[in-house]
């Protein structure tokens, strides 16, 4: 067993990633040595990734009405969460949404659709979207996240230019039945294996804060090492009202940092991404987390709002980090403002800043098939009381707005996404 965290970092840098005993010791460490732990994990992060931060951008191609019963998910079967629900975005709208993220500094676009898994027709849609995005932006990486894949589908995506496939293991094998019964842990492993065999970079991570033990956290990361995930997103549970995990708040900012350090020390050379829920749980310690993680999602998530995209960029630059693919932060911000202004003007000026006139998103069944094209109709989404509507001005200027707060002022309800894909409002990018 190591004596200090620096000793542990020395061992990792010498070629021996943290084992189960060391990982559990990291998770059990006290708050008063947290900065020592972060400093040790930062040494490992900088050995493999220098001071770079990779920016990723999510485009929710199809939202809600999923037939699976994952207990953490606002899009699950039986969810009462008042999220946006719509069927497939048209290709040109998917490309447009992706380009907002690229203008905001992203080098990877993540194309995501709800459902158990795609039909061959759905794979064709995503292939077409990928080709459209890459024709206009050839240096862009595209990651697809469509659920459980059938035979030949990973190969079709790779042929279209998709670079990576995301399918999170989410939790430990021993905990999986506690959060989902409509598919198995092995189903997820098989899809990651299929993606890798087709030449796609495997992206797979976890969700923390779902009632798992420290032992199960380590077990989950051991499983990620076994499937050889290139990129590991760490999501922090967003406990949506209307889901089985509603009201579950188990994490502290310090615990979140310890989890990130544990993952970095167990998987030293893998992209480690702070993902959904980071604003809710890391809170004011978000900037510190970039000394451990080397990747994040820009702006909003699939069904909830993130912090303002410009705040994301400021957090990266103010921490002394370099955005992958971007040489100058000021030039990036200037391009971002020009990009937004051009889109507002194209939509009719100030009166159209919410995006009026964009193709409506269609309603229909989710799962392995979308609704037939001739049956697709716009779905109106009422904004429930207490939930802020998307801002008509520039997206990304405000802050995360949450309704309920505890005595310390911490948000207790995530803000539902009402801008970007599936809406007439400019995205947070």
Where are the model-predicted features located?
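Hydrophobic faces of well-ordered beta-strands that scaffold small-molecule active sites
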Residues: 53-57, 109, 142-144, 165-167, ...
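Conserved Radical SAM active-site core
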Residues: 77-205, 209-210, 214-227
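Zinc-dependent deaminase catalytic domain
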Residues: 4, 31-37, 42, 212, ...
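N-terminal pre-triad scaffold of radical SAM enzymes
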Residues: 36-79, 86-110
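Active-site phosphate/pyrophosphate- and oxyanion-stabilizing loops and adjacent acidic/basic residues
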Residues: 42-43, 131, 261, 287
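Auxiliary Fe-S-binding modules of radical SAM enzymes
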Residues: 1-32, 225-429
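Conserved, mostly hydrophobic/aromatic
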Residues: 15, 41, 70, 111, ...
